[in-house]
Amino acid sequence: MTALPTAKLDQLVARHAEIEAALSRGAEGEEYVRLGREFSDLSPVVEQVRALKDAERDLEGANELLAESAADPEMREMAEAEVERLQDRIEALATAVRLALLPKDAMDERGIILEVRAGTGGDEAALFAGDLYRMYTRYAAEKGWSVEILSESEGTMGGYKEIVAALHGRGAYARLKFESGVHRVQRVPATETSGRIHTSAATVAVLPEAEDVDVDINEADLRIDVYRAQGAGGQHVNKTESAVRITHLPTNTVVAVQDERSQHRNKARAMALLRARLLDDERQKKEAGRAAERKGQVGSGDRSERIRTYNFPQGRVTDHRINLTLYKLDEVIAGTALDEIIDPLLTEHQAALLAAAEDA
């Protein structure tokens, strides 16, 4: 493993101290906000660097004690144990510093647009899509995020043919960005009389929420259609033309929202969804051309990739990208154990990024 960039680390520590002094002198307005944000960004890595330097000083002292205790077996044993402990701590802190120095995904702190669509499997696929959507909304509730449904198309027996929702909360994208892909379920459907296990699938897409400045949309490039909202069976459920469909002509991207009775609110939601999709398309194109980033991905990043299987008869969940199996299906589907899959995925992603940085 390559040595840490000590000169850069010293610069970060010095900059952190400089900002702290400026804040204590009473910076105001936008300057205060800017400095406060930079101070918060630097604090984690600076704390790790200081802890690392403290551990290195402690190791020097432990090595000196070890050298002086050659004639005292008991003291030597204690010194050897302390040296080993400090070496392990230094290695862990050095890894933490390297991780803190990795380039951050600018979208990580944002909320998300969550899209869940039933795949192969008919009614059972729609029911499973509903299970996945509820799993994510329960997880969002645990994290203190709010959920706003943008559009939905219910299945004939329940669940969803498609549902799109915004999950508003800091860090939602960082936690859920690796949920994109094909999720497969194996279980006996409620309508199955012979007890046979069926396999169905649903596709999940996680997009970072887009801000106005992220995507430049020319009004002339949009075709906006309004129509009467329809229910699950195709019947009209609204006497006014409140549903909105927006087509971005240059990319032929189409979004439609009909959940609100207000055409104005539906249009605002549709524009938010359109911005997110256009931003995501642009990010996908950029990432496809970056070999180092491809190496740093968990899985292929392709939304047609099968990423996870939920086997109900065995109570098993398997994430195929990292060969992780948990026998906690009920807890995962309830959202309470989803972090036990997400955390290893993030760890694997960080390890891949570190390896790519080492090779660069």
Curated annotation (Swiss-Prot):
SMART domains according to UniProt: PCRF
A single Gene Ontology CC term: cytoplasm
Chief place of localization: cytoplasm
UniProtKB keywords: Cytoplasm, Methylation, Protein biosynthesis
Keyword Plastid: no
InterPro entries found in the cross-reference section: PCRF, Pep_chain_release_fac_I, Pep_chain_release_fac_I_sf, Prokaryotic/Mito_RF, RF-1
Modified how: Methylated by PrmC. Methylation increases the termination efficiency of RF1.
Composition bias, Basic and acidic residues: 284-308
Matching PROSITE patterns: RF_PROK_I
Modified residues (N5-methylglutamine): 235
Subcellular location: Cytoplasm
Region (Disordered) location: 284-310
GO molecular function: translation release factor activity, codon specific
SUPFAM superfamilies: Release factor (SSF75620)
Pfam families: PCRF, RF-1
Family membership noted in the UniProt record: Belongs to the prokaryotic/mitochondrial release factor family.
HAMAP family, alphabetized: Rel_fac_1
NCBIfam families named in the record: prfA, PRK00591.1
Described purpose of this protein according to its UniProt entry: Peptide chain release factor 1 directs the termination of translation in response to the peptide chain termination codons UAG and UAA.
Protein name as it appears in the record: Peptide chain release factor 1
Organism listed in the record: Xanthobacter autotrophicus (strain ATCC BAA-1158 / Py2)
